Structures are given as C-alpha cells and as structure tokens.
Amino acid sequence: MWSLQDSIFTCERNHEGENIIHYLCRNGGVIDLLTFRNAINDENRYLLSEYNRDGKXCMHIVVSQDKVDPINKLMLLMKWGADINSKDQKDGNTVLHIAVLTNNYEVAKWLCQQPGVDMEIINFARKTPYQIACDRANTRMMDLLXKNGARCDVPLKINTARRRASHDYGVKLIRMGESAR
C-alpha cells in the first residue's frame, strides 16, 4: 500500500497558484486534510507557510473561505506547525484580522483563546483586530475581543488629537517658524 509518510512534495501548483494544502483548505474537508497528516513532515512543512497568488497561506484561506468546519481545520494546521500570527501578503492581515473582517464570531473567539495569538498585531494599515471592529462599529466583535484580552485602544486621527489637546488643555500648537503670541 502507498503511504504519504515518506513522500516529499514538489513545488507544483494549480492554475490558481495553490499547493495541495491550499487546495484542500479551500475545497476539502477535515477528513481530506487528515489524509495528508503523515505527509506533513520536516521536508513538507513549508507547504503550510507558502503563499498562493492572492498572498494567502493555508490559515488565511481557511478563515476567509471555510464556512463548514474552519476551527477543526485550523486546529489541524496549527498542530502541523502553521503560524497563527502569520500575515497575508496583500493587507498584512492575520487570521484574527480576517475573522473580524468577515464577522466570524465563532472563529474569532476560538482564535482569541489560543496560546500564542497576538491580539495586538497590526496589519499594513496599522490596525489591530480590535481597531478594525471599532472602525466598522461592530460592538459585538469589540466586546468579544475585549472580553478575551484585547486592548481597547483606538488611535485618534492626528487632527482630532490636536484639536482636543488645544481645546481641552489650553495648548497652543505652534507651526515651525512661528512665534508664540
């Protein structure tokens, strides 16, 4: 009988630029992924961190695409060594950012409870998952994140901060080259 245990996968990709694990994360179930459990060894572990043409690794694909059983897929991928805090190449979003953006409360809650998850990590827009929830006025997601330990900091726009400082504290802002009157 043929075994995947000692197999080494080549770098072949499908027409969408996906390796076999990307494909199974998008189109397969947990059972399909489990078929490859013995094949994810030191020689093949790179498949978990490879990016497809959309700039997503396997974890990002699961959170953004799987509506059936994402948590069990994520558990399996993490057991194999996938990074819970890896950022996609397009927006710098982690799986927690994506769960917030897609209003996936169940996955967001589960991710928040995982050891090693960085709830304060910022994407390329310099936003934490909590700040994204705040920008979208998603109070349910904001509450979920806060209850699971997210810092509830929302940066003020620079002009808003200046106006508040000058109004609330009597601070006069002076431009370079001007003198205080």
Curated annotation (Swiss-Prot):
One annotated GO biological process: symbiont-mediated suppression of host NF-kappaB cascade
Keywords: ANK repeat, Host-virus interaction, Inhibition of host NF-kappa-B by virus, Repeat
Molecular functions (GO terms): NF-kappaB binding
Superkingdom of the organism of origin: Viruses
Keyword Mitochondrion on entry: no
Family to which the UniProt record says this protein belongs: Belongs to the polydnaviridae I-Kappa-B-like protein family.
The protein's role, per its UniProt record: Suppresses the host immune response through NF-kappa-B inactivation. Possesses ankyrin repeat domains required for NF-kappa-B binding but lacks the regulatory regions required for dissociation from NF-kappa-B and degradation. Therefore, prevents host NF-kappa-B release and subsequent activation.
Protein's name according to its UniProt entry: I-Kappa-B like protein C2
Organism whose genome encodes this protein: Microplitis demolitor bracovirus (isolate Webb) (MdBV)
Species lineage: Viruses, Viruses incertae sedis, Polydnaviriformidae, Bracoviriform, Microplitis demolitor bracovirus
